[in-house]
Structure formats: C-alpha cells, structure tokens
C-alpha cells in the first residue's frame, strides 16, 4: 500500500516541476517578443552622425547654378540648417523651365518671382493654405527652375522639430513630406529670395558624405500637368532609408 503512495507523490512533484518550467519558458518567450517589438519601432536612420556641425561647409553659389534636373540628385545627403535645427535631405523633385508642373510656367508674378532669381536662393510658397513648401532655385537668374525638398531626416534640434511639428515622435512621419519639412524649419514665405549659400538664417551645407544609392520615380501630386511631365522620372530619393514620403512603390533604383 505504501509503494503506490510514494509513486503518486513522485508523479505530483514531477508535474509541479514541469509546470514551473513551462511558466518560466513562456515568460521568457513573452519577454523576448516584447524586446523584438520594441526594437522594431526604433528609427532606421540614426539621429547622430560622425560629421560634426563645425565640419559642415556652405555650398558655393555656383553649386546651384545648373539645370534643376542635375541639381536635384546632388542635393541628396546635403544638410539644411536653421538655428539649432539640422536636417539631412533625403527626397527631392526637379522642376524645370517649360515644365507644365513648374510654377515658372506662369511667368513672373508676385508669387513666382523668387523662382526666376539666381540659383541658390530659397523659394517658399504656401500650398493649400496650410503647408510651407521649401524649394531651392536652380540655374541662372531668369530661367525659372527649382528643386522641391520633399523629405528630410533629423540630425539635430529634435526637440525644436517636434515642438514646431506639434508631434512627439522620432519616426519618419515627422519629416516625410514637404509641408512637414517647412514646418520643422519654421519657414514662411518671407524666406523666399534668401541666399542659402550665405552664413546665418537658412543654410545649405555639405557634410562630406556622398549618397551612393539613389531611387528615382515620377513626381507626386501633379496630375494637372502634361502626360510627359507627369511620367517624367524627376523625383529622387536616398535608397535604404525610411525618411521618404509616399508613394514609395513608384521609386526604382537609378
């Protein structure tokens, strides 16, 4: 009669140990899954760089005074700085003279006059009564061409960026769109005509980092333009970064 009792006690003990082990394994799996989910929400592009701001150099006027289609990809990887905010340019669009999507097609008006200024000046316009859109004037004075800054990634001044955007996040939604870039830099139309190659105010800087992989695709939101301009591959973006705007599936390797 004693042997079955001892066997029953031993079985109960083994089952108890098994249950404890199972609970430990489940807790470990849950913890590991939580860590994995936490890792997935981190920004894919680092917010700090090896190049310090003191090493960044202003681009000279002649850098800008070329065809907008040539200037656009060269702007990728460059830096926009205003006050304590520094952004890295990750996406742009070229707008050329005689382009049915370019503001220059209207000729010189009070609104479009900055587009006809010398290359290297800012052209900021209000879109839909809400968004300040930053463009960099290209080519020689009187040509009427520019490059739209569509997206950037943050380098410094994150608190100021978040405050201006009214958004407490470090994810790409912070800067993946031209209106968001203008807001993060605190721009208004008064910045039009400002020379980006002069120290102070709004500056375009080179940090000595070349972009090796570039994506190209048609521009966004220009359905009103002629078909040849709607389909032109004049949108450029840094490859392998999440800091670009939608649609992303229209971008292909250059």
Curated annotation (Swiss-Prot):
Region feature (Disordered): 1-20
Catalytic activity, as annotated: Hydrolysis of alkylated DNA, releasing 3-methyladenine, 3-methylguanine, 7-methylguanine and 7-methyladenine
Predominant place of localization: nucleus
Cellular localisation: Nucleus
Source organism, top-level taxon: Eukaryota
InterPro entries in UniProt: Formyl_transferase-like_C_sf, MPG, MPG_sf
Similarity comment: family membership: Belongs to the DNA glycosylase MPG family.
Identification of the protein by name: DNA-3-methyladenine glycosylase
Gene: MAG
């Amino acid at each position: 009669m004693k042997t079955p009792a001892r066997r029953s006690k031993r079985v109960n003990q083994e089952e108890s140990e098994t249950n404890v082990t199972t609970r430990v394994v489940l807790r470990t799996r849950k913890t590991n899954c939580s860590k994995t989910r936490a890792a997935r929400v981190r920004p894919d592009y680092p917010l700090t760089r090896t190049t310090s701001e003191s090493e960044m150099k202003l681009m000279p006027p002649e850098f800008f005074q070329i065809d907008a289609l040539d200037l656009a990809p060269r702007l990728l990887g460059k830096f926009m700085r205003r006050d304590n905010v520094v952004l890295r340019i990750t996406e742009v669009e070229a707008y050329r003279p005689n382009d049915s999507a370019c503001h220059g097609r209207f000729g010189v008006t009070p609104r479009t006059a900055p587009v006809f200024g010398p290359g290297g000046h800012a052209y900021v316009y209000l879109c839909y009564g809400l968004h300040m859109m930053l463009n960099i004037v290209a080519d020689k004075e009187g040509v009427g061409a520019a490059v739209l800054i569509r997206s950037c990634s943050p380098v410094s001044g994150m608190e100021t960026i978040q405050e201006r955007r009214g958004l407490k996040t470090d994810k790409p939604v912070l800067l993946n769109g031209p209106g968001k870039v203008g807001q993060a830099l605190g721009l208004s139309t008064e910045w039009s005509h400002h020379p980006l190659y002069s120290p102070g105010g709004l500056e375009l800087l080179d940090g000595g980092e070349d972009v090796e992989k570039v994506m190209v695709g048609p521009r966004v939101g220009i359905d009103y333009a002629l078909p040849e301009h709607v389909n032109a591959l004049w949108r450029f973006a840094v490859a392998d970064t999440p800091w670009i705007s939608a649609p992303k599936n229209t971008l292909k390797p250059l």
